[in-house]
Amino acid sequence: MLLPYLNKDLIEAGCDEAGRGCLAGSVYAAAVILPKDFKNELLNDSKQLTEKQRYALREVIEKEALAWAVGVVSPEEIDEINILRASFLAMHRAVDQLSVRPQHLLIDGNRFNKYPDIPHTTVIKGDGKYLSIAAASILAKTYRDDYMNRLHEEYPFYDWNKNKGYPTKKHRAAIAEHGTTPYHRMTFNLLGDGQLNLNF
């Protein structure tokens, strides 16, 4: 069972991203503030849910959350600042848009660039530990999936409606055959075995 909060007396926002390991498309992040008494048996790590379950949960989360928001960082920005910083920036943009200001942030992962004036705690595999991070994981993934499905209509060769921009054999074969699109991350190793070229 996922934990409802880390700090009972603080307004907490859970944050998570989607699309960090992709070769194409923006990186998305979500921030979610849930009521302290929020319960949902189905809510778990979004990677373990079916697509249908994720979209059903998105409706529940958006209806019952005290506040939620989604932040986006474009492929051009990713290439400019690197994917790790872009993931943090997407989370910052999500927090910026929250209608309720959180007093604490729960961040999925082990690193984060501090958000101004709001303390944070990083939680490794947090989407499998805290409800608010799991909720953020679902929003980030479903909104990014919607975006990749729209891009697929524009560029059907790359199979983005299925791989969502991740480095599958078919995706890499399409890059080799058709070249790149404006949505590909040009600082990534698009054809090789390595997924990321990170320059710190």
Curated annotation (Swiss-Prot):
InterPro entries: RNase_HII, RNase_HII/HIII, RNase_HII/HIII_dom, RNaseH-like_sf, RNaseH_sf
GO molecular function: manganese ion binding; RNA binding; RNA-DNA hybrid ribonuclease activity
Cellular location(s): Cytoplasm
All copies of domain RNase H type-2, residue ranges: 10-200
Domain of life, per lineage: Bacteria
Essential cofactor(s): Mn(2+); Mg(2+)
Keywords on record: Cytoplasm, Endonuclease, Hydrolase, Manganese, Metal-binding, Nuclease
Enzymatic reactions: Endonucleolytic cleavage to 5'-phosphomonoester
Gene Ontology biological-process entries: DNA replication, removal of RNA primer; mismatch repair
UniProt-listed Enzyme Commission number(s): 3.1.26.4
Cellular component terms per the entry's GO annotation: cytoplasm; ribonuclease H2 complex
EC top class, as a word: hydrolase
Annotated a divalent metal cation binding sites: 16-17, 108
Entry keyword Nuclease: yes
Details of cofactor binding: Manganese or magnesium. Binds 1 divalent metal ion per monomer in the absence of substrate. May bind a second metal ion after substrate binding.
PANTHER family: RIBONUCLEASE H2 SUBUNIT A (PTHR10954), RIBONUCLEASE HII (PTHR10954:SF18)
Function noted in UniProt: Endonuclease that specifically degrades the RNA of RNA-DNA hybrids.
Family: Belongs to the RNase HII family.
Name of the protein this chain belongs to: Ribonuclease HII
Organism: Bacteroides thetaiotaomicron (strain ATCC 29148 / DSM 2079 / JCM 5827 / CCUG 10774 / NCTC 10582 / VPI-5482 / E50)
Gene for this chain: rnhB
